[in-house]
Amino acid sequence: MGLYKQFLTKISGNAFVQRLLAAQARDMNHAMGIGTSGDFSNDGEFIVFDLIRKSCQPPYCIFDVGSNKGQFLAYALNDMKQTDYDIHCFEPSQETFRMLTSNSPSNNRVTLNNLGLGKESCEAVLHYSEDGDEGASLTKRDLRHYGINTNHSETVRLTTLDEYCLTHHIEHIHLLKLDIEGHELDALSGAKKMIIGNQIDIILFEFGGCNIDTRRFFRDFWHFFENTPMDLFRATPSGYLIKMEKYKEEHEQFCYSNFVALRKI
């Protein structure tokens, strides 16, 4: 044990120092992009638009999977207003889709789809606490510790990204954004042909507490991308991308974080 660790061990045997250490750990994690997801302006997500402009040529094709009420769409429209683009939005909940439609400007370059993306085309049950719930999930989550009851549900339609692209004659996606509360890996599985075919440049997805309920670990994402022509990174608030060189158990951090997969050049 090094001298610094010995010093910490000696002074840490009380509640006050433990609280200081916990606060320090949270600050350090935040700087590394762990637990930062949720505030678009401060969680590293914005970096994807810089990446698109630097590495891709317009017209840009963007998939917003898990559109909710149009929060990400609003950022994308503002960022892309000086260029050519096509944005495809996916929101399976009927009431939330109505909110999305109401919040979205009339724009023939934006396609709103009242369905979700998954590993197969089917019907599924969506669970949520209230209309427009940002945490709506295809898994009934146990959120009693937050005083939240996901006691509402509805049957929704799902398709796969590969099937959607085939039907709509989409040959390339510049940005695939996934925020579907623990079912991101299912959507990735349904996009395997496009990913393996080098037809997706950038994938942005969230990992966090919802993965506790779906029992999907970071290890599962690591092994998925290990067999694809993409490199995996964690986004930080500064915009710096930390490359996930190899899997470590310490990566299993269930406070919400954003990850970016980039097509290998």
Give a label for each model feature.
Residues 1-265:
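Phosphate/nucleotide-binding beta-alpha loop and adjacent structural elements of enzyme active sites
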